[in-house]
């Protein structure tokens, strides 16, 4: 009798499954599989390269800069550092880019939101051919009140909902592609559109394979018509161990990557108003992406109360904060350099200083002067461009398409009190 009851239950289960609308059973399996994949995702690190473009309301897209960061996925969170640095920070990646649009959440946040219980409404759209693969497509809607997605801007930070689609492999249940657009945008954020596309791929880490982002892109449009587009790639992914030194061993040559730096908690503060002259240890060119580590040396002893506080030749470490191309008025770059620490005979100091003077070099300066005369027979007028001060970041212009700050390029700095 017991076996008959079990058999009857099995028949009822099969009958119920056969009566489910198309795609329902597959959706349940895709969601369960994705949650299991996120749970088993180990601590790992990838090199993220971001090609950023911008345009005005009536312009074509033009390159802005290239940002390279190491992104560490650890215990459900994403952290960031310049390539080659071990000081991963849990702050938003915009802190490393010095302006412009940049995003996060590609490892787990979006997939976690998408497959959460009771959060999302789905609609099965059938199977489609995508790059030679037969994939099941689902449209979805995620309300802002259930979303973990936020948009960070100068005007503020707000939580948004999303609507979009994802494509899953019906055989492996892997989500292969994700596309979504922001909804319920808070009125204080001056944007009309924010869209994301992510491609996922099985990546071998150690002896196992995991589902990781391979490429992604974002597009944001402001209410005034200005548009920003980012195209991202993730490469050189590997398991991360807290005690190991990070080195990607990149196949392409990417200058400017430096050795491991100390954590901020290990750095001693420097008193304010010290005058320090530095010289670049290596040239800075267009090959140095935003986020790349840079090095310089102190030129001349820095005295303090009759003794040498920082000896000549001490190593100074930092990173490229900005490298933005602007094509107006003949074209120019905005360059921002942020030095963070000085190694003075084994004692590491926090370097927090304002740039006072630049070496003489063609087209390099704190301001740009343009002749705005329309008629050469009439006395001319000029337009002067300057840059806002950013504490701790030396920002300046380089006129023309060529950017080459040579080895030995001199910069004079004055230290300032650490911000509270």
Where are these predicted regions, by residue range?
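Glycine-rich, flexible loop segments associated with nucleotide phosphate handling
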Residues: 155-165, 334-337, 400
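Generic anion/oxyanion-binding catalytic loop in active/binding sites
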Residues: 5, 162, 397
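Hydrophobic h-region of N-terminal signal peptides that target proteins for export
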Residues: 5-17
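Short hydrophobic/aromatic-rich motifs at helix boundaries and adjacent loops
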Residues: 5, 96-98, 311-312
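Contiguous beta-sheet cores, especially beta-hairpins with glycine/small-residue-rich turns
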Residues: 176, 265-420
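Structured extracytoplasmic
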Residues: 17-163, 170-176, 181-269, 420
């Amino acid at each position: 009798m017991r076996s008959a009851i079990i058999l009857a239950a099995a028949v009822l289960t099969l009958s119920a499954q056969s009566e489910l609308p198309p795609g329902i059973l597959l959706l349940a399996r895709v969601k369960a599989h994705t949650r299991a994949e996120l749970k088993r995702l180990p601590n790992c690190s990838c090199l993220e390269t971001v090609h950023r473009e911008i345009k005005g309301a009536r312009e074509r897209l033009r390159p802005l800069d290239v940002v390279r960061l190491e992104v560490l996925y650890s215990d459900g969170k994403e952290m960031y550092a310049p390539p080659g640095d071990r000081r991963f920070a849990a702050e938003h990646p915009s802190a490393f880019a010095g302006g412009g649009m940049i995003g996060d959440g590609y490892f787990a946040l979006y997939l976690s939101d998408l497959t959460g219980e009771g959060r999302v409404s789905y609609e099965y759209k059938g199977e489609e051919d995508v790059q030679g693969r037969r994939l099941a497509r689902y449209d979805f809607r995620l309300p802002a009140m259930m979303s973990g997605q936020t948009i960070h801007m100068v005007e503020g930070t707000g939580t948004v909902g999303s609507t979009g689609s994802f494509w899953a492999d019906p055989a492996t249940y892997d989500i292969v592609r994700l596309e979504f657009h922001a909804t319920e945008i808070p009125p204080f954020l001056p944007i009309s559109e924010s869209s994301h596309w992510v491609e996922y791929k099985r990546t071998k880490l150690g002896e196992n394979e995991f589902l990781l982002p391979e490429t992604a892109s974002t597009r944001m449009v402001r209410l005034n018509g200005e548009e920003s587009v980012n195209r991202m790639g993730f490469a050189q992914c590997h398991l991360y161990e807290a005690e190991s030194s990070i080195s990607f061993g990149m196949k392409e040559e990417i200058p400017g990557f430096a050795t491991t730096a100390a954590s901020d908690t290990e750095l001693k503060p420097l008193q304010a108003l010290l005058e320090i002259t530095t010289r670049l240890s290596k040239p800075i060119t267009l090959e140095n992406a935003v986020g790349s580590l840079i090095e310089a040396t102190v030129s001349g002893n820095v005295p303090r109360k009759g003794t040498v506080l920082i000896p000549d030749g001490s190593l100074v470490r930092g990173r490229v904060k900005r490298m933005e191309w602007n094509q107006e008025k003949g074209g120019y770059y905005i360059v921002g350099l942020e030095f963070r620490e000085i190694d003075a005979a084994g004692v590491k100091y926090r370097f927090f200083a304002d740039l006072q003077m630049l070496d003489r070099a063609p087209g390099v300066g704190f301001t740009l002067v343009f002749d705005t005369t329309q008629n050469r027979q009439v006395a001319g007028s000029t337009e002067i461009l300057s840059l806002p001060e950013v504490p701790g970041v030396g920002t300046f212009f380089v006129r023309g398409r060529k950017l080459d700050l040579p080895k030995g390029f001199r910069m004079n700095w004055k230290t300032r009190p650490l911000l509270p």
